[in-house]
Amino acid sequence: MLITEIFHSIQGEGPYAGLPMLFVRTNVCNIRCEWCDTKYSFYGGKEIPLSELLGIVKEAKEGWVCFTGGEPLVQRDALAFVKSVVDMGKNVLIETNGTISIRNFVFSDRIFIDMDVKPPSAKVTKGFLMDNLRYLRKQDYLKIVIKDDTDLDFAIDFVDRYGEGLSFVFQPAWGSDIRRIADRIVGTGYNVRVLPQIHKIIYGDVPGV
C-alpha cells in the first residue's frame, strides 16, 4: 500500500475528537480540494507491503486506527487492510471524500465512517456519490468544511434536502470564524455538531499530528 505517513496522535476532527489513534495516511487522492491541508499526500509516498503495515498496526497500543489520506479507498488493498485491522479487535475510522462507494466497508460495528461533502470553496469537479448516504449508520457522519457564507448556505441546504436520519459535522476551515457558523445553527434543531480541528489547537497546523 502506498503510504505517506504513520503516526500516533489525538483525533482532532468530528464526534470522536480527543481519542488517541494510530493514523495511517495513504498517498494519492482522486480530487484536489482548494484548501486541502494535506496536499503533501498527493505525491511521493512509500510502498509498504500489507503484511508489514499490519504488523505496525498490531504493535500499536491504540485501540483505534484512523485510515486517512489522500483518499484511502483508492488503495488496492484498502478493504483487506480494514478487514485485518477489525480482526485484531481494533476500531477503524475511515476518512473518505464520498466519491467512492463505501458499500463493502460497512460490514462491522468496529468500522466508523467520516465522509466529506465538499462545499463550493473546495472547487472540486468529481461529484459526491449520493448512493453512499444509504450505507451510513448511527456511528457514521458527514463532514462539511466551511470556509465562508456560501459554504454555510450550501451545508444547511444539504442538511435540509438529505439530512433526515444522518449526523453532520460542520467544521470551520482553519482560520475561519467558528462563532459565525455556530450562530447560524443554534436554535435550528439540526442534527449538526459545530467543531473545530482540535489537533491544530493543540499542536498547530503542522504535518504528522
From Swiss-Prot:
Record: residues binding S-adenosyl-L-methionine: 70
EC number: 4.3.99.3
Radical SAM core domain segment(s): 16-205
Enzyme class: lyase
InterPro entries per UniProt: 7-CO-7-deazaguanine_synth-like, Aldolase_TIM, rSAM
Record: residues binding Mg(2+): 38
Keyword Cell inner membrane carried by entry: no
An MF annotation (GO) of this entry: carbon-nitrogen lyase activity
Assembly behavior: Homodimer.
Recorded family membership: Belongs to the radical SAM superfamily. 7-carboxy-7-deazaguanine synthase family.
PANTHER family: 7-CARBOXY-7-DEAZAGUANINE SYNTHASE (PTHR42836:SF1)
Protein name: 7-carboxy-7-deazaguanine synthase
Source species of the chain: Thermoplasma acidophilum (strain ATCC 25905 / DSM 1728 / JCM 9062 / NBRC 15155 / AMRC-C165)
